[in-house]
Amino acid sequence: MKLQKPKGTQDILSVAAAKWQYVEGVARETFKQYHYGEIRTPMFEHYEVISRSVGDTTDIVTKEMYDFYDKGDRHITLRPEGTAPVVRSYVENKLFAPEVQKPVKLYYIGSMFRYERPQAGRLREFHQIGVECFGSANPATDVETIAMAYHLFERLGIKGVTLHLNSLGNAASRAAYRQALIDYLSPMRETLSKDSQRRLDENPLRVLDSKEKEDKIAVANVPSILDYLDEESQAHFDAVRSMLEALAIPYVIDTNMVRGLDYYNHTIFEFITEVDQSELTICAGGRYDGLVEYFGGPATPGFGFGLGLERLLLILDKQGVELPVEEGLDVYIAVLGADANVAALALTQAIRRQGFTVERDYLGRKIKAQFKSADTFKAKVVITLGESEIKAGQAVLKHNQTRQEMTVSFDQIQTDFASIFAECVQ
């Protein structure tokens, strides 16, 4: 049997990983500017943490979760999304306590798991960057969080991203709209897909989220949820829109957008771009004012989003964005003969301790092969170290582009390599 990675997973090799690290680094820097701190939650949770919060009737719970019973007969699931685990942690660790400053702003970066048909930008193990903000019902929080995602895309150089916006209103507004959907869709029940016939009974808003052709036809002219917002919900949505306009962030209203999770209320949004003539959602989120209370905490407003790293990197690649990923070595040490092995080891460590990236030959190859490795590694400087250099206590440094050489003592290299390096590469 040939052992291979499971279907829907990937190995992220070092060249690609450098791009991942760059994107993650830009995200961390951006979130820090907005006063977000990192949180790390377990990769697996009790099944109920996800099923009850995400929604028992959602596709995530009914079709896509990796769940199992452990040896203690506990029902466990690999996390399919990031918000529910963070809310669980917020409540469990009593971050709602009065001594904790509000709002509490958290971000996470990590693996999520869903049993889906693998395709470009969508894997069974995928990586998500997400943020959650607890304790503010101010519409400015909605807008600031959306603006933070918009800011991140700008910093990464992504173009052609469109903000899709909608409001699900409060509980009363949703209840009124739920009944309106039932009244509208019930006469055409038989034309809906089997899944949407079930959704019509359990959670009619899920029908709007269907990707099936027959369902899209059925909901093409459904009533708009915006017509069912009460005064409070309308005021919140109006404030969000006016603040987005004040920040010059363009948006389109998408009244059929409901998001795939049941915990949302009021503002929901998606950032969508076009890839290979198909629309692709790269970031989505919204407000979830009842979720903390649902987990046993006090009534606490919340707002957040998640974005897929694989999709983000796919879009960067499709748009031809060159990420400023650092490549190459500062120094490559060519080692001539076994007698130079110990000296090369000491010199390599001394240069590394001064903050430089260094590699050396370990294979006892001929000098020509070592110089070829230095070129492959894009080394800026090559140090040649052999028996004669060791006897003299000096090494020859060569600029790997201009081929200019200089000779310096081992003591100088070990104590002030920064000055030597700067002189060599100037």
Swiss-Prot record:
Pfam families according to UniProt: HGTP_anticodon (PF03129), tRNA-synt_His (PF13393)
Enzyme Commission number: 6.1.1.21
GO biological process, one term: histidyl-tRNA aminoacylation
GO molecular function: ATP binding; catalytic activity, acting on a protein; histidine-tRNA ligase activity; transferase activity
Subcellular location: Cytoplasm
Gene3D superfamilies from the UniProt entry: Anticodon-binding domain (3.40.50.800), Bira Bifunctional Protein, Domain 2 (3.30.930.10)
Enzyme class, first EC level, given as a word: ligase
GO cellular component: cytoplasm
PANTHER family: HISTIDINE--TRNA LIGASE, MITOCHONDRIAL-RELATED (PTHR43707:SF1), HISTIDYL-TRNA SYNTHETASE (PTHR43707)
Alphabetized HAMAP family for the sequence: His_tRNA_synth
Name of protein: Histidine--tRNA ligase
Annotated organism of origin: Streptococcus equi subsp. zooepidemicus (strain MGCS10565)
Protein encoded by which gene: hisS
